[in-house]
């Protein structure tokens, strides 16, 4: 998984079309690219390109179904398979298999930027936690080959994943090491129960 913005995104995808699977779009709350504001629109999105071999691990996190979507389909009861007006049972199972209130994730992710950033391209830890949970399980290893200030490492540690980070700049490596060491892993209330 790699972050990018056009025209880099296109070059990234074309560098290995065979392994490119799909992309997410991260919608930020604050615009960027102000130095070019007189010549092009400000950017509030960044692409997240997913690459992998034959099949990429994917553990979708349920998203809430909007009220407007819920209002279009009336639940009429009906046992193990939903019985909805205006939608077949098969269609319901494919689109809303998490239950009446949740559906599959959409490819646009909305997360604000970090308030106290240490690096010019720093990503928000909650966004990275979302992506890590979407593609890995506890105890697996997360690699960030452009670690920067270590936000991916912080997210990985919080989620009980192993982490390998690579950073060329000594200043940012020190910042990342400190942040990751200070991060607290999440605690499960029932992890010791039989």
Residue positions per predicted region:
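S-adenosyl-L-methionine
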Residues: 180-194
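Core catalytic lobe of class I
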Residues: 1-165, 171-175
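Charge-rich, low-complexity terminal tails
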Residues: 165-166, 193
């Amino acid at each position: 998984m790699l972050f990018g913005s056009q025209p880099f995104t296109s070059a990234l995808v074309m560098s290995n079309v065979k392994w490119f699977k799909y992309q997410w779009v991260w919608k930020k709350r604050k615009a960027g690219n102000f130095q070019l504001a007189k010549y092009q629109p400000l950017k509030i999105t960044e692409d997240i390109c997913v690459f992998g071999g034959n099949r990429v691990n994917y553990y979708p996190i349920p998203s809430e179904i909007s009220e407007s979507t819920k209002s279009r389909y009336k639940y009429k009861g009906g046992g193990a398979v939903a019985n909805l007006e205006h939608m077949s049972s098969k269609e319901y199972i494919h689109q809303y298999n998490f239950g009446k209130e949740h559906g599959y994730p959409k490819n646009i992710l909305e997360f604000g930027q970090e308030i106290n950033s240490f690096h010019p391209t720093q990503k928000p830890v909650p966004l990275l936690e979302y992506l890590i949970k979407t593609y890995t399980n506890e105890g697996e290893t997360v690699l960030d080959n452009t670690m920067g200030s270590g936000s991916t490492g912080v997210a990985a540690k919080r989620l009980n994943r192993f982490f390998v980070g690579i950073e060329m700049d000594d200043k940012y490596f020190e910042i990342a090491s400190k942040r990751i060491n200070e991060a607290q892993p999440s605690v499960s209330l029932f992890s010791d129960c039989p």
